Amino acid sequence: MKPYPIQFVSIVIPVYNEEQSLPELLRRTEAACRQLKHEFEIVLVDDGSRDESANILQAAAEREDSPVVAVILNRNYGQHAAIMAGFEQCRGDVVITLDADLQNPPEEIPRLVAQAELGYDVVGTVRNNRQDSAFRRWPSKLINLAVQRSTGVAMSDYGCMLRAYRRTIIDAMLACTERSTFIPILANSFARHTTEVLVEHAEREHGDSKYSPMRLINLMFDLITCMTTTPLRLLSIIGFGMAGLGALFALMLIVLRLIFGATWAGDGTFVLFAVLFVFTGGQFIGMGLLGEYLGRMYSDVRARPRFFIEKVLRSQPAAPAPAVTVDGLTSTHTDQVSP
């Protein structure tokens, strides 16, 4: 693994209804980036916020010599689509993704950049002393385990969005055309060298989590169906297993009927119904998984854009001082011109 030279760093932050945390987020993120020896930009993507987030981002981007780039989407497309929109607009050799809720401190950015300079394609993070509820932690652990089994890349915390990506990984992800994606997994599918660092995790100070129970369920389906065909293979295995169990059970019923007579068979009616419901449930699960895959194929065939960018706002460099000519001598306001 060779060191990776970095000239420019981009920070990409998706924003959705975060007007209360934005002033502190901008201040802390810019202060953390000032510690770097590289040039930098802070790309904030407003994902269809219903509060004043877009106006705050626009004002920040319009400041003279501001490092902020404001990307305004026309509606809400979801966290990962917003990040992909930021990837399209950023130009860094290394790109850092960060959530806007300040649960992961921006002060960790220099550590991730230092790891990326060592030559890693992807630098993941693991949340230390995670402040989320058990309702969020346990499903996250199950998802991480399932992702590790599906991708073969052993990372401990796929749910933490504070991550660093090399430019080549960003370009590879932008070349993908699927509508639904999960960026940490997609990045690892292109990465050769990956690592993780331990980062602090704070409680959310403003607002509520944007991941409701229904959104978490949708995210789990995205993880299951958008990155691997393993569930389809498991479905075939389960189907063969259930068919085998059904054949054995039918054989057992025939033998028991021959031994105990028709009376026993009548008493076993409820057992048959129970088994029928089990197999029927398995069939519906399989049909649901097939429906998910077919739905995603339908979305990809339509080839609609993943998002629509309404506008991009960048700061303009400071205008040069006007030249003043006195007695044939030209000067700016910083020069001293003798009368």
UniProtKB/Swiss-Prot annotation:
Q: Which GO terms describe its molecular function?
A: phosphotransferase activity, for other substituted phosphate groups; undecaprenyl-phosphate 4-deoxy-4-formamido-L-arabinose transferase activity
What InterPro entries does this protein's entry cite?
ArnC_tfrase (IPR022857), Glyco_trans_2-like (IPR001173), Glycosyltransferase_2 (IPR050256), Nucleotide-diphossugar_trans (IPR029044)
Q: List, alphabetically, the HAMAP family matched.
A: ArnC_transfer (MF_01164)
Q: Where are the bilayer-spanning segments?
A: 235-255, 270-290
Q: What NCBIfam families does the annotation carry?
A: PRK10714.1
Biological function: Catalyzes the transfer of 4-deoxy-4-formamido-L-arabinose from UDP to undecaprenyl phosphate. The modified arabinose is attached to lipid A and is required for resistance to polymyxin and cationic antimicrobial peptides.
Lineage, top-rank taxon, reads Bacteria
This protein is called what? Undecaprenyl-phosphate 4-deoxy-4-formamido-L-arabinose transferase
- Kindly indicate whether the keyword Secreted belongs to this entry: no
What enzyme category does the UniProt record give? transferase
Report the principal subcellular site: membrane
Locations listed in the record: Cell inner membrane
Q: Supply the EC number(s).
A: 2.4.2.53
Pathway per the UniProt entry: Glycolipid biosynthesis; 4-amino-4-deoxy-alpha-L-arabinose undecaprenyl phosphate biosynthesis; 4-amino-4-deoxy-alpha-L-arabinose undecaprenyl phosphate from UDP-4-deoxy-4-formamido-beta-L-arabinose and undecaprenyl phosphate: step 1/2; Bacterial outer membrane biogenesis; lipopolysaccharide biosynthesis
Q: Which gene encodes it?
A: arnC
Topological relation to the membrane, as annotated = Multi-pass membrane protein
Query: Which reactions are catalysed by this chain?
Result: UDP-4-deoxy-4-formamido-beta-L-arabinose + di-trans,octa-cis-undecaprenyl phosphate = 4-deoxy-4-formamido-alpha-L-arabinopyranosyl di-trans,octa-cis-undecaprenyl phosphate + UDP
